[in-house]
């Protein structure tokens, strides 16, 4: 009986230790995620500046980036299940290899593999009549078929749906992660882009 009491009293301690260890791992992952995000943002900003042309006009006449979108699995701003950070784009589930289209005319400012976004493409669409610059980012592609500096037109195929990079949780399957940046700031893409 005394041994059973002693064993029962140590169970909460071991549960607390396990919870603390899990919290430490989660915090470490969160910090790594934030560092990777900062590095990605710096890279994308530098690439955008490299290919930015103030004379390029963005008409804001966007098209859907996929042949069809059945649903949105994660919306812009929803808390991330792992890091509890706001989601930076909209996730559109689709079959592996589904064509991904440029939503508008522009110049590819980045086409590379990144740790968090996997194979991704950023397109700078230019400046709209309101003076704001627009860019879109397409992530987790299985592969892309454009290169930095390439001019693309609305509806051109730029890559294929995949699940590369840091995909997890409910969004761990094949999907397009789509971001819209206005003057470099992430904005809800579904406010501008048909789906």
What is the meaning of each model-derived region?
Residues 38-119, 128, 154:
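Surface-exposed, glycine-biased beta-strand/turn segments
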Residues 75-77, 103-104, 111-112, 124-126, ...:
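Active-site-proximal beta-strand/loop segments in catalytic clefts of secreted hydrolases
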Residues 87, 118, 133, 171-175:
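Short edge beta-strand segments in beta-sheet-rich domains
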Residues 87-89, 140, 175-179:
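Histidine-centered divalent metal-coordination motifs
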């Amino acid at each position: 009986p005394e041994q059973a009491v002693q064993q029962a009293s140590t169970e909460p301690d071991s549960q607390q230790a396990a919870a603390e260890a899990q919290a430490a791992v989660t915090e470490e992952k969160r910090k790594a995620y934030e560092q990777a995000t900062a590095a990605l943002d710096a890279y994308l900003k530098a690439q955008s500046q490299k290919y930015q042309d103030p004379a390029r006009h963005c008409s804001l006449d966007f098209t859907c980036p996929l042949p069809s979108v059945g649903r949105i699995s994660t919306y812009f701003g929803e808390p991330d299940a792992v890091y509890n950070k706001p989601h930076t784009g909209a996730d559109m589930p689709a079959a592996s290899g589904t064509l991904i289209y440029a939503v508008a005319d522009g110049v590819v400012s980045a086409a590379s593999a990144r740790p968090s976004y996997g194979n991704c493409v950023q397109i700078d669409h230019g400046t709209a009549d309101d003076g704001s610059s627009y860019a879109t980012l397409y992530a987790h592609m299985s592969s892309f078929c454009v290169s930095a500096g390439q001019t693309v037109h609305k509806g051109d195929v730029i890559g294929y749906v995949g699940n590369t990079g840091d995909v997890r949780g409910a969004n761990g399957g094949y999907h397009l992660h789509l971001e819209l940046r206005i003057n470099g700031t992430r904005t809800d893409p579904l406010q501008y882009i048909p789906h």
